[in-house]
């Protein structure tokens, strides 16, 4: 029986792990002898607002209530969790449907936004209907947060603990909220980096984490900067690089963006005044 290790605990190959499934694989030294291995699950998830399907995303089938909340906030569909009256996660044809009940005011705003897009030619950029939606205006963030880079090292070491699926599949991204003292308050993982961030933003809103910063295991794209800024996150740390558009958006909305985060190293792209050694 093959054994895997998650958070120091041995995990048998026949153990259930939410968001992962088993599959027989072959290795060069045993091409005729299959062995069990773990694969991260990836399923289509439809977000349905008041009975109207809004978007379908590929995601890990876990923490979907947090995903729905975080996506709704980061896309400006709602202003606060109170704008959502209920969330139901239901199996659907070849995937999962997340039914979200919006307040009448927010649903009216969503319908108006969708009507404004009708008849426009899609540009094919991440499902956005027109190029003007890329880098859409975000209110400039205040400068209320500070963070010591020396406290980030503990969070970087502990980030892998968030990736229970990733530890046995090597196939997920992580997003965590880091308190000013370097403690990981919580985190999420997903096969999609944007979905992992949305799940974290949902958890942050639910838990009302205010002080601290977001840390992601991936690169920082413009979408991740924009989503963070929409939710009032002032500092975003990324393990990998940032794109040029991400830096442009971060500069414009006053977000402190830091890439290549490693113990003892970081590249600060924008607004370093929030940071100290």
Curated annotation (Swiss-Prot):
InterPro entries: Cytidine_deaminase-like (IPR016193), FdhD (IPR003786). GO terms for molecular function: sulfur carrier activity; sulfurtransferase activity. The active site is at 123 (cysteine persulfide intermediate). The keyword Cytoplasm applies. Gene3D superfamilies: 3.10.20.10, Cytidine Deaminase, domain 2. One of its GO terms (cellular component) is cytoplasm. One of its GO terms (biological process) is Mo-molybdopterin cofactor biosynthetic process. Keywords: Cytoplasm, Molybdenum cofactor biosynthesis. It is found in: Cytoplasm. It comes from the Bacteria. Required for formate dehydrogenase (FDH) activity. Acts as a sulfur carrier protein that transfers sulfur from IscS to the molybdenum cofactor prior to its insertion into FDH. Belongs to the FdhD family. NCBIfam families: fdhD_narQ. HAMAP family: FdhD. This is Sulfur carrier protein FdhD.
